[in-house]
């Protein structure tokens, strides 16, 4: 361990001048390929020669092409499953007709025989989808809007009634709703106009004083009772013969209570 350089592959040589030179081991001789194996290297570089060799039917190249084809199929299936499940760049059947799909599938089969490298087939595999998957997607797309339209249809239309009858029924229902809304608006406006006219006839602190409908009714009742007392008439429900002063006091108390409630709301 003291002199590690003695065991190293490099040898130190002392020259005449005293300088030390390092001598490395000679590299291993380069192995040249024999002429027997040269056609195989040339074959993998040129795909046309590969196709011709496969056509000749030599056993070694046939076995090699079968291995490459099996690897190509396995890699292709994995890539196809991944690409189709992720639903990226899905091809719709409406955009691609059946004739184009068949031509694409035939080209893919031919390319598997011609191309010797599996990497090229892997890159081109995600662009072509099986015909069965495209047909299934076409059926699903055609069935989806049909089911939605059936759910959207009314029960009467599904029962077999013509579209004209359904349209007429809807028009009649809309007319009835419009008439009912008009009657309700007329009733509300009539009641409001009657209370406004009564408010102008009953006594109040000012002509423009705002009173609720309940206050207007109370003041109107007491006002009528007070006028009846002046005419020596008794309009009380229990016939207790209220005096004119009591009727005026009730009107005054109602007006005061209404004024206080309005101030609290403001």
UniProtKB/Swiss-Prot annotation:
Residue intervals of the bHLH domain: 175-227
Keyword match Magnesium? no
A Pfam family this chain is assigned to: HLH
Name a single GO biological process: positive regulation of transcription by RNA polymerase II
Principal localisation: nucleus
Places the protein is found: Nucleus; Nucleus speckle; Cytoplasm
Question: Could you tell me which residues belong to the region Disordered?
Answer: 140-164
List every stretch annotated Basic motif: 175-188
Q: Its Gene Ontology molecular function terms?
A: DNA-binding transcription factor activity; E-box binding; protein dimerization activity
GO CC terms, sorted: cytoplasm; nuclear speck; nucleus
Q: Any phenotype upon disruption?
A: Morpholino knockdown of atoh8 causes two phenotypes. The severe phenotype displays a shrunken head, reduced eye size and fused somites and most embryos die within 3 days. The mild phenotype displays an abnormal brain shape with smaller eyes, a curved body axis with indistinct somite boundaries and frequently reduced or no circulation. In addition, the yolk extension is hardly visible starting at the beginning of tail straightening from the 17-somite stage.
Q: Where is the composition biased (Basic and acidic residues)?
A: 150-160
- Where are the annotated segments for Helix-loop-helix motif? 189-227
KW RNA-binding (keyword) present = no
**Record keywords, A-Z:** Cytoplasm, Developmental protein, Differentiation, DNA-binding, Neurogenesis, Nucleus, Transcription, Transcription regulation
Query: Entry's SMART domains?
Result: HLH
Q: Which PANTHER family match?
A: BASIC HELIX-LOOP-HELIX PROTEIN NEUROGENIN-RELATED (PTHR19290), TRANSCRIPTION FACTOR ATOH8 (PTHR19290:SF102)
Entry function: Transcription factor that binds a palindromic (canonical) core consensus DNA sequence 5'-CANNTG- 3' known as an E-box element, possibly as a heterodimer with other bHLH proteins. During development, is required for heart looping and swim bladder formation by acting in concert with GATA4 and ZFPM1. During the development of both the retina and skeletal muscles is required for neural retinal cell through modulating PAX6 and NEUROG3 expression and myogenic differentiation.
Protein's UniProt name = Transcription factor atoh8
Query: From which organism does this entry originate?
Result: Danio rerio
What would be the name of the gene that encodes this protein?
atoh8
